[in-house]
Amino acid sequence: MSQSTCPKRRARALPLIGASLMAGSWAAAPSRAVELPPQQLDEVVVTGERPGPGMWHVHRGSAQLWILGSISPLPKGITWRSTQVEQLLGSTSQVLVPKPLEIGIVRILWLLITERQVLMVRGGKRLKDVMPTSLYARFALQRAKFTNDPDKWERYRPIIATAFLQQAAFHQVGLSARLDLGAAVRSLAKKHGVRVQEVKIAGVGDVLDALKTMQPATENTCVEASLVTIESGLPRLMDRAQAWATGNVERIENLPEPAEVDACLAALDSGAASGDLIARVRRTWLESLVKSLQGGGVTLAVVNMDLLLGHSGLLDELRAQGYEVDAPVG
């Protein structure tokens, strides 16, 4: 079956681009930058059961909120040690987790019929026909490094093809976006009979709307920034992943954001019907956290670290509203 008609491959494209544009980093401004070594592609060697970082403790009076920070990608060989969270769940009244960007098989098949033009290059053209020559040359060079197929992803539009390439690069250096901390905590909460509240950050419709109206120049800006990450930013992502696995919050905070974040979030925002998707995500999370504190009791939340940290991150917002924020210990 040809690449352009393979339903399984196209079915993976929507969740993949959603994760690449949204779940990776709803970023606050980057913190202090550190000098990084030249690109080295040694595989991440953190394996086995790892604790991840400690939790932030937000409190005022009797209200308590524990926040577990997540990042993506993570070392593909690790298993998250959930002991601390399981102990906390014994006294927790509710859990806040991101609502997953997932769709059932019927919805996937319908989208493949109705939205194929959103994912693929139109008019029977190929990727090399629609990308600027210099940008395509860089894409092709990286594709040759991480795959054995010189025509791989040629039928996909640039932003989708680059997302696939990025995942291939992650896999080769020992990184994976498959460890879903929110899903893991959701399962633990259900096991312990704790109520789960899902915070919807965006849906498939948001991704489709953004892709439908995204201008080629804006898309190419995101693609170029993503290629920079693949070309020279993998050591930084590997360092962040190792820091998370070993609980080194300070290291994560000091590392700069991936180059693609601002460009790709801007691309998503420019294509979103509301025009303020990024601000809406930040506002939704802040409102959910504050509401949990106002309700009293003990809440556990899983929130992306890039949303938490940095100047005007969610932790700063909570401090500004008069809540005490204790940093993770250890």
Please state what every model-predicted region is:
Residues Q3-I17:
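Bacterial N-terminal signal peptides that target proteins for export
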